[in-house]
Amino acid sequence: GIIVQELSKITVVKKVIIISSVKSRHELPLMMQLSKKTKAYKYLPLHWIDDFESLVVFVFGPMVKKRISLYRKYLSFRDENYLKWAIHQIVNWEQNKHDKYTIHIHGTHDLVFPSIYIKNAIFVNGGNHAMILRKATWFNENLPRLITQG
């Protein structure tokens, strides 16, 4: 979501649709905002990323064990260097406000970017950070309309 918003600044777009993301640094969870000030994010023990089941349970909640193989495919970027870079980019993102053409779809149960920090979004009840996988029916029913409407 953040990357596509940055790309929209250097190319002409009609709309940007982000899912399970944030539109500005103000929507980041308080811990991420504090981490920027303290630089605590630099000391995260990212080696635990190889313990895939723990990672999945942390990010998506304990009810996901049945879907481990699907999440393994979805979370293919588990390289420690990539994660350090990505966390640094997210925590230090400077965007203060979003563009009018951004459509934000967000789950009410997202643990990575909790919905209490999210403003002006289409909320998917029960959706978590991986709702693009778990709520396929909702996306199949609603995305075509969101893409084509004015």
Regions found by a protein language model. Give the residues of each.
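Glycine-rich nucleophile elbow surrounding the catalytic serine of serine-hydrolase chemistry
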Residues: 1-8
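Short loop/helix-cap segments at secondary-structure boundaries that form the rim of catalytic
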Residues: 8-10, 97-98, 112-120
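Flexible "cap/lid" loop of the alpha/beta hydrolase fold
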Residues: 12-47
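Short aromatic-enriched loop/helix-cap "lid" or pocket-rim segments at secondary-structure transitions
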Residues: 28-32, 114-118, 135
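Conserved alpha/beta-hydrolase catalytic His-Asp/Glu region
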Residues: 48-96
